[in-house]
From Swiss-Prot:
Organism: Canis lupus familiaris
Higher taxonomy: Eukaryota, Metazoa, Chordata, Craniata, Vertebrata
Cytoplasmic side: 63-76, 135-158, 220-270, 328-370
Function noted in UniProt: Receptor for arginine vasopressin. The activity of this receptor is mediated by G proteins which activate adenylate cyclase. Involved in renal water reabsorption.
Pfam families from the UniProt entry: 7tm_1
Any GO CC annotation of this UniProt entry: plasma membrane
Annotated protein name in UniProt: Vasopressin V2 receptor
Main location as per UniProt: membrane
Length: 370
């Protein structure tokens, strides 16, 4: 039998336990105070960053909804923000309280619910990005299918599938984790994972890495490559332009149309690189240390870099809203207007503020479709 210690969000929920002492006082006093302070500071920073950034983007989208300017891409950006807010509220915040008290303070039902919701947030954040990329692929490569399936609905099929998979794939957490005695009759309870076989922990960590990181990353990269090839093929005449790409695109027939497609292609290439690179950079360190801890009995579990990297499961939730807001001119213009509205509520200042707000308003008037 294998018991997994669970004193951080997902990392230690899946990692081998540190040796426990015989008494409850010894169990509670084993942590490095400086490392605990670093953990709390890191989790607090991540929580504020995730909540603030996603809240701002949701506020910008809400302004567009009130004005009747809701576009299909905004559906996915909105649900991605909701998924990332779930990460902040159900993963980072409980983990912050958990690290502050060392042991999980709550009944068994709360332990299972927290571990379940922590995993739901991880899955939903990754799968919403994948759903958004799949929808962009369908809209560009097979536009008729996109219209037929109602891509502009606020609850469309990819969004529902992403949430459904997140809820279903997180169910094992309800059965793996429970309030258990952390020592041999010590009387100290913590929210720990239990695996009947020694290989259970390794199998579970590997499965999570594949389903949360590897599979979505490959899907996102593949869709973005196909989107780029479709846009590129529309600029190249000839029967071979669809070979190896996707179907349903259209060819531009005028120089101005070609210029617009060239600009769209350049934007798509930039967005592809940013999405894939940021996604990999945010998730790779976390899952590398997870797999290392699961497969290597000699892993430095108590080292400060190791412990802090294990807390970065939600790092991608900090970057998601800004990536898509940056590449959506309508959302970025709404954010400018939102900032200007907040500044206009402050005491009057110099003229440049008014000029910047007017500029933001002009951006908003020009772009209402993206």
């Amino acid at each position: 039998m294998l018991l997994a210690s669970t004193t951080s969000a997902v990392p230690r929920t899946l990692s081998p336990p540190t040796p426990a002492g015989n008494g409850s006082r010894e169990l509670l006093d084993t942590r490095d105070p400086l490392l605990v302070q670093a953990e709390l500071a890191l989790l607090s920073t991540v929580f504020v960053a995730v909540a603030l950034s996603n809240g701002l983007v949701l506020g910008a989208l809400a302004r567009r909804v009130r004005r009747g300017r809701w576009a299909p891409m905004h559906v996915f950006i909105g649900h991605l923000c909701l998924a990332d807010l779930a990460v902040a509220l159900f993963q980072v915040l409980p983990q912050l309280a958990w690290d502050a008290t060392d042991r999980f303070r709550g009944p068994d039902a709360l332990c299972r619910a927290v571990k379940y919701l922590q995993m739901v947030g991880m899955y939903a954040s990754s799968y919403m990005i994948l759903a958004m990329t799949l929808d962009r692929h369908r809209a560009i490569c097979r536009p008729m299918l996109a219209y037929r399936h109602g891509g502009g609905a606020r609850w469309n099929r990819p969004v529902l599938v992403a949430w459904a998979f997140s809820l279903i794939l997180s169910l094992p957490q309800l059965f793996i984790f429970a309030q258990r005695d952390v020592g041999n009759g010590s009387g100290v309870l913590d929210c720990w994972a239990h695996f009947a076989e020694p290989w259970g922990l390794r199998a579970y960590v590997t499965w999570i890495a594949l389903m949360v990181f590897v599979a979505p990353a490959l899907g996102i990269a593949a869709c973005q490559v196909l989107i780029f090839r479709e846009i590129h093929s529309s600029l190249v005449p000839g029967p071979a332009e669809r070979a190896g790409g996707c179907r349903g695109g259209h060819r531009t027939g005028s120089p101005s149309e070609g210029a617009r497609v060239s600009a769209a292609m350049a934007k798509t290439v930039r967005m592809t690189l940013v999405i894939v690179i940021v996604y990999v950079l945010c998730w790779a360190p976390f899952f590398l240390v997870q797999l290392w801890a699961a497969w290597d009995p000699q892993a430095p579990l108590e080292g400060a870099p190791f412990v802090l990297l294990m807390l970065l499961a939600s790092l991608n939730s900090c970057t998601n809203p800004w990536i898509y807001a940056f590449f959506s001119s309508s959302v970025s213009s709404e954010l400018r207007s939102l900032f200007c509205w907040a500044r206009s509520r402050a005491p009057p200042s110099l003229g440049p503020q008014e000029e910047s707000c007017a500029t933001a308003s002009s951006f908003l008037a020009k772009d209402t479709s993206s």
